[in-house]
Amino acid sequence: MKSRRSMTVVLTVGTVLIGTAATADAATGRPVAVWEMNERAGARTMVDSGGRGLHGRIGREVGTDTYVSGATGYRFDRLEPDSPPPRPGHLVTVRDADALDPGTRDYAVTIRLRTTHKFGNLVQKGQATVSGGNFKLQIPGGIVECLFRGSVSSVLVSSPRRLNDGRWHTVRCARYREGITLSVDGTTVARSPGWTGRIANSWPVSIGGKTSCDQIDVGCDYYAGDLDYVQIDSE
């Protein structure tokens, strides 16, 4: 950054705020993890500067110490969608920890990204059918989507415009009891009401795609582009 039980799913789709200059919601609580992604070339450990020691493992295909447009971060090369075999070296993973689960707390994920592509999962913990729920940010068609799936419902919110324009964008998705908000570059662009309920699973945080996939029955949804940092905050 230089510059676990069965549930009934009710999906609530985000309501886009168009033509508003509303500023992003206030910061949610305190940092849980801060991954600045400033490691040297060839590094295999992503350092957490948030103080909890939630360091990550950098896959061998991830380009560290990548400088572009005033920022140093990680580069994820494009891989052909749904083409086996899976490429786990394309991912950065952080082992499961209670602090990384949203639980029932206010919880926010912030990511700074730059891409010209239109596909892939940015960051997630868990997958669609796992016990305990999951969350993820993804960028289908260049539109950033944020999903939180919990014990009560699933709530989805989407950016109103494409962000795959080759520029750096800071995206923040926050889950509150009232619903989910999405901000882009400091401005709230969408909200979706609804309480997700508790989210707590035993999966790692994965950056750049899925950890459990085969590219045949389950696509790995590998991200292509650059990331400057990822930060998680909670109450």
Language-model region placement:
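Secretory targeting and sorting signals
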Residues: 1-26
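Extracytoplasmic low-complexity segments
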Residues: 5, 25-87, 190, 201, ...
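Extracellular glycan-recognition modules
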Residues: 29-32, 41-46, 82-145, 180, ...
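Short hydrophobic/aromatic patches on beta-strands that form ligand-binding or substrate-lining surfaces
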Residues: 35-36, 48, 107-115, 171-173, ...
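Acidic glycine-/aspartate-rich tracts in secreted/extracellular proteins
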Residues: 37-44, 51, 114-119, 128-130, ...
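Flexible glycan-contacting loops in extracellular carbohydrate-active proteins
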Residues: 71, 192-226
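Short, aromatic/His-centered strand-loop micro-motif at the edge of beta-sheets
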Residues: 146-170, 217
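Localized edge beta-strand/strand-to-loop motifs within extracellular or lumenal beta-rich domains
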Residues: 167-181
